[in-house]
Amino acid sequence: MSVYRGALALLVCLFAFSATALGAPTLKKAPNDAVTCTLPDSNAEALVILSNFYPGYWWDHTDLTIAVQAHPSATDEQLDAISDAIATWSSTLEDCFGGLITLTDVTGSKRQAADIVVHFVPTAGGVVFGGYALCGDHGCPNILVRSDLPPSLDREPNDPEYLGWVTLHEIGHALGLGHTTNLLESTDLMGYGWPDLGDPVLSDCDVDALAFVFAWAINGTEPAPPGEGPYDCSLD
């Protein structure tokens, strides 16, 4: 069984004081009208909206870029897993928002800094975390994912499939999604129930919550932080 717990700071946000600005936009249409794809349901009850707790933790543009910076020891299989996770989010956004919200992999490009940067450091985190998204003022330059556990635990490194799942989860944080409110039992991608209770599910609620996060873009208005969460998955 793999050991993974995401950033502890994001767990604390479940009960933190909300810093959402008054007058934040809400969707003028139901999320299922704004989203143009059909994804599986999950057992998530609601999703925390991170900008409610971290001012500036939202995007003021929708043409997002992402890049990978990997440790020299990274294997091809590990790099492929991270790349596949990015491609999954990229294609999901394209399918679900019709090009309105995009995520482009610019790994290796020197033209400009990416909005989101995934750092793969095999031994980072010790026993504390398997992935961590440190985001802030309209940017997320520090997603950290790892594969190797400390030797004292006497466990094999996490396999590439699991590394890909962690990367998917952390990119979800970078886009603005917090954890599920039923955190420990949920197998939604943004929960902690996987893999013990089943494979993670990139769900209908995840993309509907992103429609909530990017309400300003969907409504065609000026950029503004999301409304008050958590996003209730029963609304989709």
Task: Cite the ranges covered by each PLM segment.
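Bacterial N-terminal signal peptides that target proteins for export
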Residues: M1-L8
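Metalloprotease/metallohydrolase-associated module, dominated by Zn2+-dependent proteases
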Residues: A24, G139-D154, E161-Y162, G178-D236
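Disordered inhibitory propeptide/activation segment of secreted metzincin zinc metalloprotease zymogens
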Residues: A21-E77, W216-D236
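Bacterial N-terminal signal peptides
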Residues: A9-S18
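Metzincin-family zinc-dependent endopeptidase catalytic domain
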Residues: Q78-L183
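Divalent metal-coordination and catalytic microenvironments
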Residues: I66, W89, H169-G172, M190, ...
